[in-house]
Amino acid sequence: MRIVVKIGTSTLAHPGGRLNIRHTEALVKVWSDIKNAGHELIIVSSGATGLGVGKLQISRPKDMVTKQAAAAVGQCELMYTYDKLFAEYSHTVAQLLVTWEDFDHPHRLNNLQNTLERLIQLGAVPVINENDPISTEEYSLGDNDRLGALIAKYNHADLLVLLSDIDGLYTADPHTHPEATLIHRVESVTPEIEQLGGGSNSGLGTGGMSAKLTAAKIATGAGVDMVIANGANANVLYDIVDGKDVGTRFVGKNNKSVSYTHLTLPTIYSV
């Protein structure tokens, strides 16, 4: 099974922006085990700006230039951490930084698809993030929930998992409505479901429930199941892969026919 896992800033970092080392180690251990079990894994990782803020010891910037500078610093720490932790389990990571233009232009999209396919063939774990240091408002993807959905759509994933600081989609905001109940299964993202979306609760991230519902529409429209789950427990991914009733599962429509122009790759390695 090909799995795209999107990890949010609030799951990777402490509130001040510093890396949550213990939890990140636990996540990478589970991801490595999932890969050892024979699954193909693509990581879409937020955290660059948040980690950069922590590394630079500044407050969350409001201006774009400082945000981009923080992202440039944080991306180095993010990939250093992933490279070090995955290497402990004999896995190799690869970094891909993308912008909206990479999905908007067919040739660039094709290059992205082919690079990801080759990395997976070679046994690497692609780690993808938006290229925040050079992204402009016009060409920004906005949040990594959407990015994860686009990666899942255009690279024929079977499952997209959004790991965040929430358990899933509720009938109302559980922070203000204690009686709210978790919705375990969504067959279709209807206008009624979309009305349940809200803003981002984390001071470090950008994607709230509304962004996750947008991602669900993209993924399920391409035939990809999507699950929103709380990443506080690293082992939750085992239950999701096993099909257990955890978080909120958005059921993919029965079609895998997405716009996908795939160039024939030369077979240069036997993997």
Regions found by a protein language model. Give the residues of each.
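Nucleotide/pyrophosphate-binding catalytic subdomain
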Residues: 1-221, 225, 231-232
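Generic structural motif
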Residues: 10, 101, 253-255, 268
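Anionic-ligand-binding alpha/beta catalytic cores of soluble enzymes and soluble regulatory domains
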Residues: 213, 217-260
